[in-house]
């Protein structure tokens, strides 16, 4: 299975990489959060731009991205607009969403973008191609904050992301029972062992699903999300605790 290298970080080998999310509403908030994150032990910084108030003003978005890059210079920067329908803070039209991601790619400030699987196959394929032309990697994602689909459906979605050109397919689902967590882990193993030719990221959310955030190296998930201050999704734990557990499992 091939790995994905972003800056000097190799995703898909060794312990799962830790992603943290920056969620400031204004440029001032973004700068102060980035400064607070500078000393934290993480691997990838995700900017959740759907939390940013001026998201429809390209100049403001790029100014904020530039400010983040000036403060955190050495970590890969993942640009993510999480749509309202997948648990995000705002809604954009498909045209606005694609234009925003293309502007991020054009800026030269970001290393990765997040593209939601269900944006539309043609739009997704074209944007993946555009990102790759500019040496920007693509995490393709799907989120279900209500339930855990059947393992077969989870695998099917991850395989479709791979077919659409994602560098890293990602899915996050909500467990209603402990068995739902096992469904997610089973799907992860099946995808990783039978179909994946690149790293994948999977997680079962909430307190019930925490084990999935910790045991990625065992089951086949290449990255996990942790919290520096405020969690960006249910079930995230602090980056310090996360690093400790990931290291223990890696060295076992």
From Swiss-Prot:
3-dehydroquinate binds at residues 21, 46-48, 82, 213, 232, 236. The active site is at residues 143, 170. InterPro entries: 3-dehydroquinate_DH_AS (IPR018508), Aldolase_TIM (IPR013785), DHquinase_I (IPR001381), Type-I_3-dehydroquinase (IPR050146). It catalyses: 3-dehydroquinate = 3-dehydroshikimate + H2O. It holds the Pfam family DHquinase_I. One of its GO terms (molecular function) is 3-dehydroquinate dehydratase activity. Its EC number is 4.2.1.10. Keywords: Amino-acid biosynthesis, Aromatic amino acid biosynthesis, Lyase, Schiff base. It comes from the Bacteria. It is an enzyme of class 4 (lyase). One of its GO terms (biological process) is 3,4-dihydroxybenzoate biosynthetic process. Pathway: Metabolic intermediate biosynthesis; chorismate biosynthesis; chorismate from D-erythrose 4-phosphate and phosphoenolpyruvate: step 3/7. Involved in the third step of the chorismate pathway, which leads to the biosynthesis of aromatic amino acids. Catalyzes the cis-dehydration of 3-dehydroquinate (DHQ) and introduces the first double bond of the aromatic ring to yield 3-dehydroshikimate. Homodimer. PANTHER family: 3-DEHYDROQUINATE DEHYDRATASE. Belongs to the type-I 3-dehydroquinase family. This is 3-dehydroquinate dehydratase. It comes from Salmonella paratyphi B (strain ATCC BAA-1250 / SPB7). The lineage of its organism: Bacteria, Pseudomonadati, Pseudomonadota, Gammaproteobacteria, Enterobacterales.
């Amino acid at each position: 299975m091939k790995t994905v290298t972003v800056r000097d970080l190799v995703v898909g080998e060794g312990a799962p990489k830790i992603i943290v999310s920056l969620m400031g509403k204004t440029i001032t908030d973004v700068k102060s959060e980035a400064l607070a994150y500078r000393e934290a032990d993480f691997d990838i910084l995700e900017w959740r731009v759907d939390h940013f108030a001026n998201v429809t003003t390209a100049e403001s978005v790029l100014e904020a991205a530039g400010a983040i890059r000036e403060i955190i210079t050495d970590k890969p920067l993942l640009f993510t607009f999480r749509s309202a329908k997948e648990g995000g803070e705002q809604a954009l039209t498909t045209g606005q969403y694609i234009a925003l991601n293309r502007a991020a790619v054009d800026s030269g400030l970001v290393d990765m973008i997040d593209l939601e699987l269900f944006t539309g196959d043609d739009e997704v394929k074209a944007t993946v191609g555009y990102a790759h032309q500019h040496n920007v990697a693509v995490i393709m994602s799907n989120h279900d904050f209500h339930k855990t689909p059947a393992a077969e459906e989870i695998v099917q979605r991850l395989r479709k992301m791979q077919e659409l050109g994602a560098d890293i397919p990602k899915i996050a689902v909500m467990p209603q029972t402990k068995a739902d967590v096992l469904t997610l882990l089973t799907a992860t193993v099946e995808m990783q062992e039978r179909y994946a030719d690149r790293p994948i990221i999977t997680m079962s959310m909430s307190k019930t699903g925490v084990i999935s955030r910790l045991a990625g190296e065992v089951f086949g998930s290449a990255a996990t999300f942790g919290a520096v201050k405020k969690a960006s999704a249910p079930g995230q734990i602090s980056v310090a605790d996360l690093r400790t557990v990931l290291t223990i499992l890696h060295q076992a």
